[in-house]
Amino acid sequence: MSSSDIDRKIAVIFATDLVGYSKHMENDENATLRGLRECNKIIEAIIKKQKGRIFNTGGDSVFAEFPSAVAAVDTAVEFQKQIKARNDKDTTDVKLEYRIGVNMGDVVKEGDNLLGDGVNIAARLEALAQPGGITISKNVYDLVANKTKYEFNDLGIQKVKQNQFHAYDLLLDPSQKRKLKTQSSNTKMIAMIGGAIAAVFIGLFFSGVLDTETKLDSSNICH
């Protein structure tokens, strides 16, 4: 199949996943399943309201596309707020939390499903997000920062698995502000370590040369 046969488009992708699903199921299966159904109804209603479309689900995860970056980010914020309100009212010990990632990128259409880097990076952003938090890519940030009143925290260049991207946290609360190691800082650290090792070897080399020359000089004097 040639690239011209692949149906591509640019899309804003929303990815969310339940934190600690397996552990919740082990602790209280009935309460977890009930809570999951409630949360699914909440997210479905918000996505529909924002004119989004769910294109894939995985039990405790949801992937949706949106007509605009603002709509996707508004959905993420509203969902997290409603989940928090639900947890505050829930009398069980099962407090469900979600991570959310939002990205805009190139995707491949496969029937009603979407695939490709645009979706993969949204999933990586979701994995990078804090429980109850939202993490977005720089291209989404550039579109929404001046159109919304949300606060953001620049996380710099991040690498998750094989994907590298510039990420931002959307701060629902000041306590969510954090600092992560960036890919550039990791590169600098490797360079510094490499430089230090090189300096040691150079020092040992010249030390050996000087020691050899000293021995030769001593030998010549003895003769």
Question: What is each PLM-predicted segment?
Answer:
Residues 209-223:
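Acidic, proline/glycine-rich low-complexity intrinsically disordered segments
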Residues 20-22, 106-108, 174:
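Feature marks short, surface-exposed loop/turn motifs that line or immediately flank catalytic pockets
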Residues 1-6, 181-187, 218:
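Short, Lys/Arg-enriched, disordered terminal segments
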Residues 2-75, 81-82:
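Catalytic NTP-binding/metal-coordinating core of nucleotidyl cyclase/transferase enzymes
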Residues 132, 139-213:
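Intrinsically disordered, glycine/charged-rich C-terminal tails and inter-domain linkers
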Residues 31-32, 110-111, 186:
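A generic structural signal for short
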Residues 4, 41, 63-165, 169:
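Catalytic beta-strand-to-alpha-helix segment of the class III nucleotidyl cyclase homology domain
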